[in-house]
Design a protein with these regions (language model features):
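Conserved SAM-binding loop
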Residues: 188-189
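Short Fe-S-cluster ligation motifs
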Residues: 196
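Conserved phosphoryl-transfer catalytic core
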Residues: 193
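Core catalytic lobe of class I
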Residues: 1-167, 171-180, 185
Length: 196
């Protein structure tokens, strides 16, 4: 389960089910917001993605190219043998890793849509949604978005070969959008029809 939020909403969601909350990912939006309060507080350029689950879910790390991996070297000291027996992970072998592919971090950077072209103020970039879907699901899985707005997550699911369920009972309130006044479910359906 992935939930997006900021500030007190994030805290409330995390505490609403402490047993299932596992960790947060930071979505760095690149475009900052909050300019009217810039002399009172820092500009905001991130949102939290809270990850909840009962047992270890599908996790397909999206590797990124980086500098070539370096050797971990040899363990030194009295307890060098203990390196191979960890109280959390148990016995393990040291594996030399080569290459330049790196595991992703807890900060994901995807630019949000500029307000002049965004359909919704809470719209998520399709590329961010695709990345999350590739990370936490396998092809053919079902992706549920229970507040899908303009349909970014269902569109991303379709593009990634997943099935999707999207629902929303709101209405587009962005007066600059061609969808102004339309129910979000209709907006999402129309946008999905445009995706090959």
């Amino acid at each position: 389960i992935l939930l997006f939020g900021q500030d007190k909403f994030t805290a409330k969601m995390m505490l609403s089910n402490e047993k299932l909350h596992r960790y947060n990912i930071i979505w760095r939006k690149v475009l900052k917001s909050g300019f009217l309060n810039a002399n009172r507080m820092p500009l905001r350029e991130h949102e939290d993605i809270m990850v909840f689950y009962k047992s270890q879910p599908v996790y397909n790390p999206q590797m990124v190219k980086g500098q070539k991996n370096h050797s971990k070297g040899k363990a030194k000291g009295e307890n060098a043998e203990d390196i191979l027996n960890n109280r959390v992970y148990g016995a393990y072998k040291v594996v030399e890793t080569t290459g330049d592919m790196k595991h992703p971090s807890s900060i994901w950077e995807f630019p949000k849509s500029h307000p002049s072209i965004a359909i919704s103020s809470t719209e998520k970039p399709i590329e961010l949604c695709r990345y999350a879907i590739r990370t936490f699901t396998n092809p053919g899985a079902v992706v549920l978005d229970n507040c899908c707005g303009c349909g970014s997550i269902p569109i991303a699911a379709k593009l990634e070969g997943r099935h999707y369920i999207g629902m929303d009972n709101g209405v587009c309130d962005n007066k600059k959008s061609k969808y102004f006044g339309m129910p979000w479910a209709d907006v999402a359906t129309q946008r999905l029809a445009e995706v090959a």
